[in-house]
Amino acid sequence: MDRRNQITSVIREYLGRNPVPKEYEVLKKQTLKLSKIINFNKDTFFFLIKKNKYTFFKDLNVSDEEIQERIDEYFTKQRRARRLGNLLAIVELQKLLVSSFTKTLGVLTTKALEYYPSNIRLDYSFMEKIADNILDSYNVVKPSEEVKGRHKVSDLVLHVNKIMEEYLRRHSNSCICYGSYSLHLLNKKIEYGDIDILQTNARIFLINIAFLIRFITGRCVVLLKVPFLKNYVVIHDENLNHVMDSFNIKQSTMDKIPKIMIDNMYIVDPCIQLLNTIKMFSQIDRLEDIHTKFDKLSIRLGTLLEYTRYRYSILLDSESILDVKYKIDIQNRKIILDFKKYNLNYIKCYFFLDEDELKKLIRKTPKTDDYIDLEAVTNSEYMILNKTMYTYFSNTTLLRSKDELHPITINALTSHALLYHVITKKFYDDLLGDLIRSLMIVEKVPVYEIIPRDKKRGKHTIIDIEKDVVFH
């Protein structure tokens, strides 16, 4: 059989019919993929899906026959496709599924090594009182009169959370948890909704989750990539309710993140989470949340503070507090903080309020003293050159007067700089201690003006396995 006949035979078997000329031209370079899909052991796949059903969807009334029918329907879907774009999307998604499901989700139901529940036992009550005082001093804006469009949570979240707990244990090298669930592991008084994760293969994982939900429940979920959040993908159900989301980061970034293990799951070091929390308070909507979520924010902040005090040996009775001078250029959207008091590997930090300006500088600087891109962990790059650190501050900037930074933003900018130091384990001791102590004596000042953050451009991209749509 000559090469053309071999290719035609593979395409014919895949489509269940002879290809038309356009289909042949498009699919002739895809024959290796098509062969893998054709030869995929769907009986073993059905067995893995069924085990996932009994492990993570126990209360769902669905028969084996229904699951088998959905699997068969999807793996013959190409026979009913008439548009080349849809056909290519089916090939891409089927290939991803057959090559990744077993090692991504299939392994979650295999026998695992025993693990022993572990926790760090700390008394958070004292720090919760301090957190109350901090939030009171941060309560400097009026409640918003605008009705906020909070995302509605899908009923699928309960099932996905069960999957995520096991996934975090089995894939601890490539997936790490942060947010309310990670704090719940430290302090059982903290409630959580979905499980927030950073991982190195978010797209593959989320597509597999979408297929698992489709085959077991029959429900259609959609993956949406949001342009203004770096490498962020969210899953919505058929009613646009939130199922789960994930940030994707490089393995090199994952390896740098300070982390702790609890119950065989890695969580982002709570000190990193504390610094990001302080940083996010420079967002006006986060300050508005203090009115409606005071107790929830207090217990989370108190937990982060107590862990950081314990783990990083912060002396609360020291009289040393944050001492930074600054210059602000509102017109050019730049802020300079002077860290001369601290023994850092630079003297001042140059904060760009527009990310493109930082990227331009990095591109035209071939040689630096230090450079690191921490992706979604800090939402910025850091470059050090000639005793100056350059970085991008992604939040709004709050002013207390026409030309004075608000204390909340000074703390936020300092936290952003400290993220570099704590993650790279360089020179953070004095600055971290001073910041924590300064939180306890923040001057309560009204917000005079808000400098907006930069606007991100781009298009939402979507993956819809039901409609055979893949937009990269």
From Swiss-Prot:
Higher taxonomy: Viruses, Varidnaviria, Bamfordvirae, Nucleocytoviricota, Pokkesviricetes
Catalytic residues as annotated in Swiss-Prot or TrEMBL: 194, 196
Role of this protein: Polymerase that creates the 3'-poly(A) tail of mRNA's.
Catalytic activity entry: RNA(n) + ATP = RNA(n)-3'-adenine ribonucleotide + diphosphate
Protein family: Belongs to the poxviridae poly(A) polymerase catalytic subunit family.
Gene Ontology molecular functions: ATP binding; poly(A) RNA polymerase activity
EC identifiers of the protein: 2.7.7.19
Subunit-level organization: Heterodimer of a large (catalytic) subunit and a small (regulatory) subunit.
GO biological process, one term: mRNA processing
Keywords: ATP-binding, mRNA processing, Nucleotide-binding, Transcription, Transferase
The name this protein goes by in its record: Poly(A) polymerase catalytic subunit
InterPro entries assigned: PolyA_pol_cat_Poxvir, PolyA_pol_cat_sf, PolyA_pol_nucTrfase_Poxvir, PolyA_pol_nucTrfase_sf_Poxvir, Poxvirus_polyA_pol_cat_C, Poxvirus_polyA_pol_cat_N, Poxvirus_polyA_pol_cat_N_sf
